[in-house]
Amino acid sequence: AVLDGDVRKCLPCGPRNRGRCFGPRICCGEELGCYLGTPETLRCQEESFLPTPCESGRKPCGGDGASCAAPGICCSSEGCVADPACEREALFA
């Protein structure tokens, strides 16, 4: 997908705001791993009310607009799956 200048980073979330929202109930960070449907994800529901789309993660994985969310984890706004393409070494290859 071609990135244009309009895409902003999704809201920060989780302990000390070290994660990013990946969906309304998903918060992930490189050091945190992923929270799904926990109190850490409550802030992510605010994304639904913001008018512009957002993007989290750097490396695409798994299709359907998903991207690497934490080492070994690939997330879309719908959920997360284990994905070896997202291992820490692969992120910086």
UniProtKB/Swiss-Prot annotation:
Keyword Secreted belongs to the record: yes
Disulfide partners: C10-C54, C13-C27, C21-C44, C28-C34, C61-C74, C68-C86, C75-C80
Domain of life: Eukaryota
Chief location: secreted
GO MF annotation, one: neurohypophyseal hormone activity
Family per record: Belongs to the vasopressin/oxytocin family.
Function (record text): Neurophysin 1 specifically binds oxytocin.
An annotated GO cellular component: secretory granule
Keyword Protease applies: no
Subcellular compartments: Secreted
Protein name: Neurophysin 1
Keyword list, A-Z: Disulfide bond, Secreted
Organism: Anser anser anser (Western greylag goose)
Gene3D superfamilies with a match to the protein in the record: Neurohypophysial hormone domain
